[in-house]
Regions:
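Short glycine-rich or small-residue beta-strand-to-loop segments that form or flank ligand, phosphate
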Residues: 74-76, 154-157, 316, 350-354
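Short, compositionally biased
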Residues: 116, 121, 454-465
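Conserved C-terminal alpha-helix-loop-beta "cap" of PLP-dependent enzymes
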Residues: 283-461
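N-terminal glycine-rich, Lys/His-bearing helix-loop that initiates the first secondary-structure elements
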Residues: 1-38, 426, 430, 462-463, ...
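Conserved PLP-enzyme active-site core in the AAT-like
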Residues: 4-9, 31, 67-70, 80-300
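Short, glycine-/Ser/Thr-/acidic-enriched flexible segments
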Residues: 26, 161, 216-217, 232-234, ...
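Conserved N-terminal alpha-helix of the aminotransferase class I/II PLP-enzyme fold
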Residues: 36-79
Length: 488
């Protein structure tokens, strides 16, 4: 088949002159930066159109579907965000009800707002000492579906940001008994298909729609993702329609070529690449497991949290029981060793290993963690913070749409207790809300936000970037805020 990235390379070297978008006209001299302008084109003859793919882009998407063993694959240049928005919109009628895992990405909540959906939350298990969310159990999904017969779809995240995988096969069987589709946000699992060292992809276990971010764990550029249709329960026409709505009408050919090149490379060299990657990764993990204070988290440490499988490419370093926290570990790795981690949390720091990593890179990380481990002190259990980022069962008093569209008033965090939030607040990354518009603000929420800020963690979503105030929703016809008597 003709490869998009090769055709783009060839075209970039040609003498065709562009009297069309984009404005740089494939001329490097037009910019102060050295970008790949010669390959940045629009929908010109021979290069197809992502929103009406009939040629080279159709072939590229079909090739990706063949590699992953799915019925149909849609490229997304707006990341997994656009794919999640499209999946939810195509699966649930406007104003309908959906069962979602509470630890879903903020894009899912944005879909709830845009489609005025009514969420039913299923909560993950959690390890409170380590501060890590576990999996979603099929039993919980079954219970919520029995209690909410009008649910039109189920959406869960697996693997989580931390690498926790739920039992997708069993969950899919439960969901299908109720005659509805299962959507799996597998943004962090695009690499599963390429090595038995990793868990099995949801696309092979009965999920109906699977979303993957190529850019997270495969050699592809930022913003590149795919939506896989895996069963006949999915209305492909609706998926196509909503992908066209939520994606830009000017998709980047550089990004699409990046996805095509990624698939081509893995088809040709993937087995050898992943063989070397998993060898170096496992060697590093065995070395890191010898540290005595900074603990590399393994699946065996998360038993009892609903975990079914674990993605070992996620390098979680627990600081529980030590004199430092996750933020401090993150800062030490960055400032002293010039190692940038993916995320920091209260009690751990997270690094993502991927097929592009080198043996030298793993060695640098191991050496840095060993050095920090040697100088870190253990502290008595009684001195450990007992607070954790728990997904507390928040009381929903308004729908997300009602709260976000209502008249709003700003209060200090302490004054807002008992009122209805009109804003999201979440730790980013990973972008999982700790409060959702329409939910009642509690004292625990306020204490959590204060604690996160004190520890240097990044609280986003609030319009007040200092996180000192929050917008609340008016709840009566006059538009004035009604104080709720419930306080903590």
């Amino acid at each position: 088949m003709e490869r998009l990235y090769k055709k783009l390379e060839s075209y970039g070297k040609s003498d065709y002159y562009p009297f069309h978008m984009p404005g740089h006209k494939r001329n490097k001299a037009s910019s102060a930066g050295d970008f790949a302008f010669e390959r940045d084109i629009t929908e010109i003859s021979g290069f197809d159109n992502l929103h009406h793919a009939e040629g080279i882009l159709k072939e590229a998407q079909e090739n990706a579907a063949q590699i992953y063993g799915t019925k149909k694959c849609f490229f997304s240049v707006n990341g997994s965000t656009a794919a999640l928005l499209a999946a939810v919109s195509a699966s649930v009628s406007k104003g309908g009800r959906i069962l979602v895992a509470r630890n879903c990405h903020k894009a899912v909540y944005h879909a709830l707002y845009l489609r005025d959906l009514l969420p039913v939350y299923v909560y993950p298990h959690e390890d409170k000492r380590l501060g890590i969310n576990g999996g979603i159990s099929a039993r919980s999904v079954e219970r919520y579906l029995e209690e909410n017969q009008d649910v039109q779809a189920v959406l869960i995240t697996s693997p989580t940001y931390d690498g926790v995988v739920s039992d997708i096969k069993e969950i899919a069987e439960v969901v299908h008994r109720h005659g509805i589709p299962l959507i799996v946000d597998e943004a962090h699992g695009a690499h599963f298909r390429f090595s038995d060292y990793f868990p099995v992809s949801a696309a092979e276990l009965g999920a109906d729609i699977v979303i993957q971010s190529f850019h997270k764990t495969l050699p592809s550029m930022t913003q590149t993702a795919v939506l896989h249709v895996c069963s006949d329960m999915v209305d492909v026409g609706k998926i196509k329609r909503f992908m066209g709505i939520y994606q830009t009408s000017s998709p980047s050919y550089i990004l699409m070529a990046s996805m095509d090149a990624c698939m081509d490379k893995l088809q040709k060299d993937g087995k050898q690449m992943f063989r070397e990657f998993t060898y170096n990764l496992e060697k590093a993990r065995q070395r890191l497991l010898k540290c005595e204070k900074i603990k590399l988290i393994e699946a065996s440490m998360l038993q009892g949290t609903g975990i079914y499988d674990f993605d070992r490419s996620k390098l979680l370093f627990s600081t529980v029981g030590t004199s430092i926290n996750g933020h401090q570990l993150h800062e030490m790795l960055r400032d002293r060793y010039h190692i940038e981690m993916e995320m920091e949390a209260e009690k751990y720091a997270l690094g993502i290993a991927a097929v592009g990593d080198t043996e030298e890179g793993f060695d640098r990380l191991c050496t840095a963690i060993e050095d920090i481990d040697a100088e870190t002190e253990l502290i008595p259990a009684a001195e450990e913070s007992q607070e954790n980022n728990s997904h507390a069962r928040m009381k929903q008093l308004m729908t997300i749409s009602q709260a976000m569209d209502a008249q709003q008033r700003r209060y200090s965090l302490e004054e807002s207790i008992g009122k209805v939030s009109a804003e999201f607040a979440y730790l980013y990354p990973p972008g999982i809300p700790i409060i959702v518009p329409g939910e009642q603000i509690t004292g625990q929420f306020v204490r959590n936000v204060r604690r996160y800020m004190e520890q240097g963690l990044e609280v986003q979503g609030l319009s007040d970037t200092s996180a000192e105030t929050i917008c609340v929703a008016a709840r009566n016809e006059s538009g004035q805020e009604e104080d709720s008597p419930a306080k903590e």
